[in-house]
Amino acid sequence: MQKKKKKKRGRKAAVIIIVVVLVLLALGVAYLVLRQIGRLDREASRIARMDMAEETVDRTVYASGGYGQVEDTIKAYMEEYVNTLQAARGVLQEEEFSNLLSADNLEADGPGFEASLAYLEEKQAEADADFEKLLKMAEEEEIMAAIEGKGINAYFRFLYRREMLDTLQPAMFTEEELQTARDSINASIESRRGLLTFLAEQQEHWELVNGRVNFDADE
């Protein structure tokens, strides 16, 4: 009788031990999962808070496994977005753009200004293409297309969607903000193009004297 009780107590103890082990394993897995998700949340929030017009995306991947793939995809996408944004805005900071109306350039490229006008045409096309790309990159369909073909399951696609659409898409520039920036850049390009075109058309009626444009007295 006592042997049977001992056997029952032994089986019960074994069951309890197994249950405890399973619970601990489950808790351990849950902890690891939450830590990985926490890393994704942290990195997405960090990108959302950055000054996208000035800063660069940290491409270090802190998560691992499928979570790491999600983080890498997020950062690759946002790096492309940030680089495109900075390229679109960067034309105004280019030395060549700033020097278009300098005495040195007026003398070197005048009086027809073929190189300067071609440069402005090129920059206009590049800026327009960049702004169109930025608009497209903010669309949900384009965002989700970046994770397709990565060979990861629906769970990780869900995490990607959550980070991108809930945290990062709202941090992207709105259509109105992009249009304002685009108009400002176009206005700067157009003002220089207009002046250089005018000088090219009137090239018989002006000359550069001591770094200044002097027109004929009757002009």
Stretches found by the model and what they are:
Residues M1-Q2:
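N-terminal intrinsically disordered, acidic low-complexity segments at the extreme N-terminus
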Residues K5-K8, Y31, R35, S188:
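General helical secondary-structure elements
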Residues K6-L24:
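N-terminal Sec-pathway targeting helices
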Residues A14, A26-S116:
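Leu/Val/Ala/Ile-rich N-terminal alpha-helices, chiefly Sec-type signal peptides and the beginnings
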Residues S102, L106-R212:
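Extended amphipathic alpha-helical interaction segments
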Residues G211-E219:
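Polybasic, proline/glycine-rich intrinsically disordered low-complexity segments
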